[in-house]
Amino acid sequence: MTLGKNKRISKGGKRGKKKAQETMSRKEWYDVVAPKNFEVRQFGKTICNKTQGTKIAADYLRGRVYESNLADLNKTQGDDDAYRKVKFVVQEVQGRNLLTQFHSMEMTSDRVYFLLRKWCTTIEAAVEAKTADGYTLRLFVIAFTKKQSNQLSKNCYAKTRLVKWVRHRITNLIRQRLSKVNINEAVTLLTRNILRDRLAKRCNPIVPLRDLRIRKVKVVRTPRFDAQALLNAHGEIPASAEGEARVVEEAQEAPAAEATA
């Protein structure tokens, strides 16, 4: 007798088909909110599964990182802010709003390549500075030498001792300035180019510089989470008409779903 599969024996009993559940019915939308030192507060939306039993939605939302363009956050025209990307990390969930804090800022790679030139010296500095409220930031500064007004030579290379002097002055100025401000004030200094202009003004007497830029900023270490400090950083959160409409719509959908069941 040939061994094989007996279709009649293996056939299961009559069962009802499993009702397909819509995936989006188990999810809800949240608004991503930036601190109050940016003009555009609610810069994005995200989605997450609803709270079910021990699976709390807020636990899955904390720690998420979102990226936006600085020109969109400050409503600025031109390319001065368009080439900088800012990242925020979610620290707390308040209703349908995700309260974020600064995570990092970086220039786009095409802008960095645009600044590179021949016949000059590139000066780079990596500085770690601590703010007054305990945040440790790592800043990467880049600058380029330029010709003097009466120079006839084709190149404008700088001597090594001058490069070290510029790097030393950049390091001291950044540490002194950031040690007196909190994280939000530090972000304002970085995004409004206040710190960059100060560095260029103090370093130009050493050697003529062009295009001094803070290429990258990232948060290396953070202090213990303080809910009150985060609320002070955000201030009054603007109401979202779309968020309120979603809450009303979901409240109306719940009784309808129960009646259908």
Swiss-Prot record:
Pfam families noted in UniProt: Ribosomal_S3Ae (PF01015)
What is the annotated localization of this protein?
A: Cytoplasm
Give the highest taxon in the source lineage: Eukaryota
The UniProt record lists the keyword Cytoplasm: yes
The entry's keywords: Cytoplasm, Ribonucleoprotein, Ribosomal protein
Show the InterPro entries listed in the entry: Ribosomal_eS1 (IPR001593), Ribosomal_eS1_euk (IPR027500)
Region (Disordered) location: 1-23
Q: How does it assemble?
A: Component of the small ribosomal subunit. Mature ribosomes consist of a small (40S) and a large (60S) subunit. The 40S subunit contains about 33 different proteins and 1 molecule of RNA (18S). The 60S subunit contains about 49 different proteins and 3 molecules of RNA (25S, 5.8S and 5S).
Its name, as the record gives it, is: Small ribosomal subunit protein eS1B
